[in-house]
Amino acid sequence: MADLEAVLADVSYLMAMEKSKATPAARASKKILLPEPSIRSVMQKYLEDRGEVTFEKIFSQKLGYLLFRDFCLNHLEEAKPLVEFYEEIKKYEKLETEEERVVRSREIFDSYIMKELLACSHPFSKNATEHVQGHLVKKQVPPDLFQPYIEEICQNLRGDVFQKFIESDKFTRFCQWKNVELNIHLTMNDFSVHRIIGRGGFGEVYGCRKADTGKMYAMKCLDKKRIKMKQGETLALNERIMLSLVSTGDCPFIVCMSYAFHTPDKLSFILDLMNGGDLHYHLSQHGVFSEADMRFYAAEIILGLEHMHNRFVVYRDLKPANILLDEHGHVRISDLGLACDFSKKRPHASVGTHGYMAPEVLQKGVAYDSSADWFSLGCMLFKLLRGHSPFRQHKTKDKHEIDRMTLTMAVELPDSFSPELRSLLEGLLQRDVNRRLGCLGRGAQEVKESPFFRSLDWQMVFLQKYPPPLIPPRGEVNAADAFDIGSFDEEDTKGIKLLDSDQELYRNFPLTISERWQQEVAETVFDTINAETDRLEARKKAKNKQLGHEEDYALGKDCIVHGYMSKMGNPFLTQWQRRYFYLFPNRLEWRGEGEAPQSLLTMEEIQSVEETQIKERKCLLLKIRGGKQFVLQCDSDPELVQWKKELRDAYREAQQLVQRVPKMKNKPRSPVVELSKVPLIQRGSANGL
C-alpha cells in the first residue's frame, strides 16, 4: 500500500508539473480579483507618499512596464516609435552570437536611426549616433552597443509621455495591481501541496502549486516546535533575511524566495522548484566529471556567488549537496541557512561543512568575508573531479583530522590536471587570504579571468546558453521516495509548548518579493485578468452612467481622497455597511451606491482618529462628541494606512484652523456643515480621475 501511495504521489506531482509548464493560468484554482478602479484615489496618494510614482520606479517594475508599454503602443502615437525602438534594443541585447548581433545591429541602425536621420526627425543626440556608427564601422557589436540610446529613450519618455500615462486608465490599472500586491496575506490554503521532496534539520520541503496563478514552487516548511527545541530561532530568521537579500535582481543561479509566511505551527519559504536532484547525488550516480563538464558547473556557480557577494552575503556552505539542478541541467545554489550579511560586521563563527571550510573560518576569532566562499569553491571543484574533498584523504570521517589538514596541508594536484585547471585550483585553495584568487580586490572578476575559463563567453553563461553536461531524466521525480526521506518523530516535540513570546519572534516574518510576484503574474494570469476586468468595468460603467458614478461627485471639488470602506456606527447595527466615502478638509461624507451623499461627519464633531482591532482585523475608530463611536474597515492594508493618515491630517489641520480663528461670541455653532459652504482649508486634490 505504501508503494502504491508513493507512485500515486509521484504521478500527481509530475502531472501538476507538466500542466504548470504548458498552461499555468489554466491550473489556477483561485482567481485574483482586482479592486474597483476607484482604488486609484487612495493608492495614488499611498504610492506618492512613498516616492513610488516616478518614471524610474514604474518603468523598472514588470507590471508597470507592461502597462506603460500598452499605453504608449495603443493610446499615444508620439511615444509608439520610442517604445518600439527600446524593445528592439532589448531583444538585440539578448542575442547569443556575434554573428546574430552583426545582422540585427545593422537592421536596427537602418530602421530606427538612419531612417530618422534622413527624414531629419531623429530626436536623439549626435553623440549617441556617433557611438553606434563608430562601433559598426569597426564591426564591433557588444551587447551594450545601443546603451546611449536606451538612456535617451528613457529621458524622452519620462516627461510629458509619463505624465499622460499617470492621467490614463492604464495607471489606474497599475494602482489596482499594486493594491493586490501590497495586500498579500498567504496561508496554506493558497497552495496545493504535493509530495515531499526533501528533509532538513527543522522541517521538510514539498512540491506545491500556487492556487491563483498555477505556478509550481518548492515549499520549505520549518516546524516551530522543533526550532524551539533546538534553539534555532536565530538560524530560521537569518535564512529569511538572507533569502530576501539575494532574491532581488536577475540571478538564475540561486534558489530564490518569492514569499515567506507562517502559520501557528510552521514557517514556510516559497522557493524556486528544482527538479533535477543535486550534484552530490549525480556525482554518486554519474561518477567524477571531466574538466569540461566541471567548467560548466563552476561557471554558473561563480555567477551565483558573484550575485551574493555583490549584496554583501557570504554563503559559507558551498558543497555538491547544496547545488541543485533544474529540469534542463542548469544549476542553482540552495539552502542559505548558514549565509551571513557582512556589510556592517564581518563574521568570525566557525560554520560550514568540514572539508569545505576555509582556514580563516576554522581559526577561532578570525574575521572573514566572501573570501571563505572562494576557498570552498576550490574544494568543491576538486571533489567534482576526484570524488572527494582535497582534505578528506582515504575517506576519513575524523572532523578534527580534516580541519587539521585544511589548516596545514599543501594540496597536491594530480598530474592529469591541465595547467589551466592547476592554476585555478592553486589560486582558490590558497590558505593565505591575501594571495587567494577572488580576494585580491576584484572579487568574482578575478576568478572569471582565469585561463581555465578563457573559452567561455560570460554573457552566454548568464543567459544559460551553454548545453549542460547532464540532463536529468524527464518523467521522473529526481528525489528519494517519501518512505526513504522519512518523517520526524512527533514524540520529540510533544513536550514543547509555543508561547505568545515565541510567536512574537515571527511577527515580521511574512514577506512578498515584489519583482518575483510581478514576474509570476506576468507569466501566468496578467493578460487574462486584465481582459476579464475590462469587460466587468465596461458593464459597470454603463450602469453607473444611469445612477451617477461615485467618483463623479468628487470632480471639481476639494476632495482629498475617496473610495469604498465599510462602516459600523449605529449601536443597533452589528453588520458592516459598505459605503463610498469622500474626505474633504472639513468633513467626511458617504453614501450607498447610487444614493445621494446625505450622511456626513464634520471635523468639529470628531474627537480623535485611532486604530483598533475587531475580530483580528485592523479598523479605524473615530471617537465622536457625546461618547459615540464610528468604526471604519478598509478592504486592504494600504487603504487602511492611507485613510488613517488622511483623516488624521484633515482633523489636525481643522483643529489648527479653529485655534487660529477668533471665537465668535454669543453665536451657536452648527455641528453640520452645509455642502454649499466654502471649505475650511484647501488641500491638494486627489480625485483620481
From Swiss-Prot:
Family: Belongs to the protein kinase superfamily. AGC Ser/Thr protein kinase family. GPRK subfamily.
GO molecular function, one term: beta-adrenergic receptor kinase activity
SMART domains the UniProt entry points to: PH, RGS, S_TK_X, S_TKc
Positions of the record's site feature: Required for receptor phosphorylation: 3-4, 10
Class in the EC hierarchy, top level: transferase
Ranges for domain PH: 558-652
All copies of domain RGS, residue ranges: 54-175
Function: Specifically phosphorylates the agonist-occupied form of the beta-adrenergic and closely related receptors, probably inducing a desensitization of them. Key regulator of LPAR1 signaling. Competes with RALA for binding to LPAR1 thus affecting the signaling properties of the receptor. Desensitizes LPAR1 and LPAR2 in a phosphorylation-independent manner. Positively regulates ciliary smoothened (SMO)-dependent Hedgehog (Hh) signaling pathway by facilitating the trafficking of SMO into the cilium and the stimulation of SMO activity.
Region ranges (N-terminal): 1-190
Encoding gene per record: Grk2
UniProt organism field: Mus musculus (Mouse)
Keywords: ATP-binding, Cell membrane, Cell projection, Cytoplasm, Kinase, Membrane, Nucleotide-binding, Phosphoprotein, Serine/threonine-protein kinase, Synapse, Transferase
Active site: 317
Boundaries of every Protein kinase domain copy: 191-453
A UniProt-annotated Pfam family: RGS
The name this protein goes by in its record: Beta-adrenergic receptor kinase 1
Domain notes: The PH domain binds anionic phospholipids and helps recruiting ADRBK1 from the cytoplasm to plasma membrane close to activated receptors. It mediates binding to G protein beta and gamma subunits, competing with G-alpha subunits and other G-betagamma effectors.
Main location: cytoplasm
Location within or outside the cell: Cytoplasm; Cell membrane; Postsynapse; Presynapse
